[in-house]
């Protein structure tokens, strides 16, 4: 069984009789000598959908669950439900808007390549996106003529409604690459 410091976002733990999907991990390194690094993890309870927070020391042993990953394409929206189709056997997977609220901020209209659904024992758990996505800037302060590629940033609203910090020289209409997990600008899209 893995230690807490080996757990990554998207894994599922069997903890206190609950199946918990890892949504976020904060690492807290104390400055005192001999103190252990703490891992504050935010989970979503697979069965109830409730949010759960737990803290672990780096050497705590945790029980992980092996998941089945299937590549899917976005199919259609039906009211409050988003339907994805398995690329191999065309099985439909349905999520409510609340279940994939975070992921929708990064999903351009029509979906994106390399999306996966996570299932365990036939139960649908989560939608997993690739590491990066290319999105268009729809609103930001105008680019400054002659602005250097300095560290000065400005907020930009993207085509999905997501707001991130981008360099000063970018303007509306440009496509940029975003690192999904860190919600940060990586560069202009190809």
From Swiss-Prot:
InterPro entries: Elong-fact-P_C, NA-bd_OB-fold, Rib_uL2_dom2, Transl_elong_fac_P/YeiP, Transl_elong_KOW-like, Transl_elong_p-like_YeiP, Transl_elong_P/YeiP_cen, Transl_elong_P/YeiP_CS. Pfam families: EFP, EFP_N, Elong-fact-P_C. GO terms for cellular component: cytoplasm; cytosol. PROSITE patterns: EFP (PS01275). GO terms for molecular function: translation elongation factor activity. SUPFAM superfamilies: Nucleic acid-binding proteins, Translation proteins SH3-like domain. It comes from the Bacteria. One of its GO terms (biological process) is peptide biosynthetic process. NCBIfam families: PRK00529.1, PRK04542.1, yeiP. Belongs to the elongation factor P family. This is Elongation factor P-like protein.
């Amino acid at each position: 069984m893995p230690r807490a410091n080996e757990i990554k976002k998207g894994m599922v733990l069997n903890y206190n009789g609950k199946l918990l999907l890892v949504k976020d991990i904060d690492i807290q390194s104390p400055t005192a000598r001999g103190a252990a690094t703490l891992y504050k993890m935010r989970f979503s309870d697979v069965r109830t959908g409730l949010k759960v927070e737990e803290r672990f020391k780096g050497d705590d042993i945790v029980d992980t669950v092996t998941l089945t990953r299937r590549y899917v394409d976005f199919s259609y929206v039906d009211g409050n439900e988003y339907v994805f189709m398995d690329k191999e056997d065309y099985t439909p997977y349905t999520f409510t808007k609340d279940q994939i609220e975070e992921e929708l901020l990064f999903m351009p209209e029509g979906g994106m390549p390399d999306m996966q659904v996570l299932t365990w024992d036939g139960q649908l758990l989560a939608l997993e996106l690739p590491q990066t996505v290319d999105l268009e800037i729809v609103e930001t302060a105008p680019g400054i003529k002659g602005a250097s590629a300095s560290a000065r940033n400005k907020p930009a609203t993207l085509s999905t409604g997501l707001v991130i910090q981008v360099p000063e020289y970018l303007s509306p209409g440009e496509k940029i690459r975003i690192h999904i997990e860190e919600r940060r600008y990586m560069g202009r899209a190809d």
